[in-house]
Amino acid sequence: MAVSAKYDEFNHWWATEGDWVEEPNYRRNGMSGVQCVERNGKKLYVKRMTHHLFHSVRYPFGRPTIVREVAVIKELERAGVIVPKIVFGEAVKIEGEWRALLVTEDMAGFISIADWYAQHAVSPYSDEVRQAMLKAVALAFKKMHSINRQHGCCYVRHIYVKTEGNAEAGFLDLEKSRRRLRRDKAINHDFRQLEKYLEPIPKADWEQVKAYYYAM
């Protein structure tokens, strides 16, 4: 993308207004927030960040976390993991301040696994549907961990499922994801983190997810 075109598109999305789904959070001299907008009949999510950086040996002075998240989403997509489709993802430095944007399409038909269980409590799904959903969650984890990548922020609100038609599962909010040298480290981190705040997933259902996972 040419520099001028990149800046033009960045400025276009930066100026876009919508409803806040994650109110601006100001900390460490930076800001982060997510708005929902409509474009050409599609629901999009615009994540904005200023001065949210990660540091590494390669980037000792820091790089925007959105740059890393974009790379992670693309890597997981190549591995067959269901993740939000990227419309735009860039970071620019303006007058010494990093600004970063990630625009993604809504995961149409998917709901968080927490919302799925809330619906299940009101209008129970069949055991066949529930088992298909649990197996889909196991498969999503298996694909992610197969490339030694851990989610890094593994909570029920970040696991999305769809049970209309073929059951599917995927992930969002991947800015803290990282690659581990050993696969078991990624598995243990994600599973232990999720198990600390497992509700509303019943423990028996989670044990079934792990049974499917280790049988794959």
Swiss-Prot record:
Pfam families: Kdo. Induction: By several factors in addition of internal pH. It comes from the Bacteria. InterPro entries: Kinase-like_dom_sf, Put_LipoPS_kinase_InaA. One of its GO terms (cellular component) is plasma membrane. SUPFAM superfamilies: Protein kinase-like (PK-like) (SSF56112). May be an environmental sensor responsive to several stimuli, including internal pH, proton motive force, temperature, and possibly other unknown factors. Belongs to the protein kinase superfamily. KdkA/RfaP family. This is Protein InaA. It comes from Escherichia coli (strain K12). The lineage of its organism: Bacteria, Pseudomonadati, Pseudomonadota, Gammaproteobacteria, Enterobacterales.
